[in-house]
Amino acid sequence: MTTSEPYERAFDEDIQRGTTEPCPECGGPVRTNSAETVCADCGLIIDEQSIDRGPEWHRDDADTAKRTGAPLTPARHDRGLSTVIGSGQDARGTALSSEKRRRLARMRREQSRGRWRSTKERNLGHGLTEIRRIASALGLADSVRDQACQLFRTAQNERLLKGRSIEAMAAASVFGACRCNGESWLIDDVAPMAQVGQNRVENAYTVLNEELGLPTPPVSLDQFVPRLASDLGCTDVVRRRAEELVVQAVDAGITTGVHPSGFAAACLYMAACVHDAPLTQADAAAAAGVTVETIRSHRDRLLSIVE
């Protein structure tokens, strides 16, 4: 009984791959395997120990995940590369003994001491933490938060923090990122979230805008209508009518020098009155952060162009 090899090649045989480029010495054909690139005629070794830059094929199994981790983020001073040492439980959720908990506490203390290589990094970490807190309180998107963090980094590199509060510059960076992205937030909305007074936040933003030349577009009144309508619980019909009133007011030229949030609230109040929606002047003023007299003044202006 004759036997034959069931496979076309042995398992330890190198896979030969041809290339289109000829040998630089004799012009003969070139063969490439997993270790080297050799000319088939003259035996010249053209390349060896090449790196396989192709994709890595493996099982897509959550239990065997490798080289995974959180993505890099500008919202942390080290881009998110620092190690976080847990406490209380291990990776399986099992409670740790008292001796291991004390050991982890000592490791966390030493790791915290080694996080900051300089005072500059410590100030950067404090400022970015403040930015994350303010962005979370305002419900900003991660992209706006990351842009605010990058703006704070630029301000620190340009030495704009010298003689100024870190908290004020952090709040100013958040407001600057909102302005650059066309978000309907005023400095009156951002400053109360900061740990310093509004005057210091305004001064810090003025420095940022003048020194860095922020590309801040003009504030548009129609940007405030959707957010105020959501806060006041207005219907889509009322919101659309308020947006129409804003367009009419801009065309009539009565919006010059007005408080944008207050005028948008007045448009919502007028639209609610037209559609018999339950919205009072006090509620509209509270949502916009203005007085009732401001709502009435803008209402009278709107009545002059509507009639």
Curated annotation (Swiss-Prot):
Zn-finger (TFIIB-type) residues: 19-47
Compositional bias (Basic and acidic residues): 54-66, 107-121
Key words, A-Z: Metal-binding, Plasmid, Repeat, Transcription, Transcription regulation, Zinc, Zinc-finger
Lineage: Archaea, Methanobacteriati, Methanobacteriota, Stenosarchaea group, Halobacteria
Pfam families: TFIIB, Zn_Ribbon_TF
Region: Disordered, residue numbers: 54-121
Recorded family membership: Belongs to the TFIIB family.
The encoding gene: tfbE
Domain of life: Archaea
Protein name (database record): Transcription initiation factor IIB 5
Residue sites binding Zn(2+) per the record: 23, 26, 39, 42
Cited SUPFAM superfamilies: Cyclin-like, Zinc beta-ribbon
Function as written in the Swiss-Prot or TrEMBL entry: Stabilizes TBP binding to an archaeal box-A promoter. Also responsible for recruiting RNA polymerase II to the pre-initiation complex (DNA-TBP-TFIIB).
